[in-house]
Amino acid sequence: GTAKADPMTVSSWGDLIQYLAWSFPLVGAMMILTWRLSNVMIDGAPVISGWPLYAVYGVLTLVYVAHVAKTLEINVPILKAGVPEEDKYHWGSVAALNSTYFANFGAELAVVSMLPMFFENTFSQLQSSEGNYIMTATLSGVIAASFAFVNLLARPLGGLLSDTMKNRKRTMLTYMVGIAFGFLGMASIGQYGEVVDGQQMIVPMFDGTLWLVIAVVITILCSMFVQGAEGATFAVIPMIKKDMTGQIAGMAGAYGNVGAGVYLVIYSLVDAKTFFYIIAAGAALSFVYCFFALEEPSDAFAEEMF
């Protein structure tokens, strides 16, 4: 029998091209991280350079080439013979869910790692009526933890809504819109202040502790959409092709890590406000892709349909 580590089987030549194209970022994200490390200096020397750098690029390229070869070896005979109608599935839906998990779980991993510093820096000058500084490293950590803690409620809710709204595609699209607006809200927490030592400072959009409370509420609402979308993504995956659920889930899950890697590299190059705008744009692009590529699963609610 075929091992589950084998590449996916696809239904058409067009799907094969899509699969190979969507497989590259799984390796490409590692290349981007390697490139970023080659630009990080410690004691005046890059973390990785010269032949070790090119060796990593070479190994990653070989991994992708081997994947392409194996994919063609498995799929070309099947496609030449013709795929039976009952075995066909819509690969565009797999690609669409890769994009949603990139934009939701990828964003979550990236944001959780930068959120404590964002709150600590943005609200560093906020003082209580007694003149004490309110924002401490501990408080900023608690606020950031609330973003992740919402997961306990939000992710199951995303799956539940996908089950109850009777249209899994519409649920997914609604969540992606919510993420886009959520991160636009996050971007509005701070505004550009002065430049200190060549670094762009971000200060609160409004003064006072009330704005800090509102900022925390914006953060939690954004997190509700981000993590609900993760639940909604995995509510669709088993509906695409039942006997390939593991492989489809594995690829979508990997795209979450690709998203985190790409977003964190971007974060190392831009300020926090721009970073939130970029994540919002990522969710908007995923929405557009899903709108055109994601098919409502035909038997998603079989008992109602037949």
Regions found by a protein language model. Give the residues of each.
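Multi-pass alpha-helical transporter architecture, strongest
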Residues: 190, 280-306
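Intracellular juxtamembrane helix-capping segments at the cytosolic ends
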Residues: 226-241
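Residue-level signature of mid-helix packing/kink "hotspots" within the transmembrane helices
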Residues: 148-156, 257, 261
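Extracytoplasmic gate region of multi-pass secondary transporters
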Residues: 23-54, 92-145, 230
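C-terminal ends and interior cores of transmembrane alpha-helices
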Residues: 177-208
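Symmetry-related core transmembrane helices of the 12-TM Major Facilitator Superfamily/SLC fold
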Residues: 19-28, 49-66, 274-292
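A late C-terminal transmembrane helix in Major Facilitator Superfamily
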Residues: 241-271
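Cytoplasmic membrane-interface "Motif A"-like loop-to-helix N-cap segments
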Residues: 163-177
